[in-house]
């Protein structure tokens, strides 16, 4: 029993040399062709490791008429009846030349696209490098700003300490001034008392002298 289902996209299983037929598989398998004149278009080889999907088989221009098989893991998956045909090799060569020119143009187009893609990649690499450099610079600036902030915080702490010391010194000076004011008041009172005593004594002496 064949575990795979094969469907030929062509309306019939008939094919002529130079044709391409499509085989659709629904499971993984190793596909092989029964005649070396045929090959798979995907890898240009007579066998291919297939996953579910569609695979094209090229019927070579040198294929002889008759039934040709396509196998899946050794079991016949499909039969292709290759017709006998008279080939105009000159027309076929012209067709191949045309296809070759088309392929060359496609290759040139792909090369140009590849070149553009490579240039875009280089541009993106340059932009990425610039962004990385900017990120590094921002990191350095951020680190410097952190250091500056830390230094300012240290200066602020020193200023706070100095201010506290100045306040303490000011309190001491104010206390000294109050003490000096108290002492000054005492000195003034003592001086006034001494002056009053002296004046009183002097007046008393004068008064006594006049009586005599």
UniProtKB/Swiss-Prot annotation:
Presence of keyword Membrane: yes
Subcellular location as annotated: Membrane
Keyword Transmembrane helix part of the UniProt annotation: yes
Keywords: Membrane, Signal, Transmembrane, Transmembrane helix
SUPFAM superfamilies, per the entry: P-loop containing nucleoside triphosphate hydrolases
Gene3D superfamilies given in the database record: 1.10.287.1490
Cystine bridges: none
Signal peptide: 1-18
Segments crossing the lipid bilayer: 186-208
A single GO cellular-component term on record: membrane
Membrane topology of the entry: Single-pass membrane protein
Stated family: To A.fulgidus AF_0540.
Protein name in the entry: Uncharacterized protein AF_1225
Native organism: Archaeoglobus fulgidus (strain ATCC 49558 / DSM 4304 / JCM 9628 / NBRC 100126 / VC-16)
Lineage: Archaea, Methanobacteriati, Methanobacteriota, Archaeoglobi, Archaeoglobales
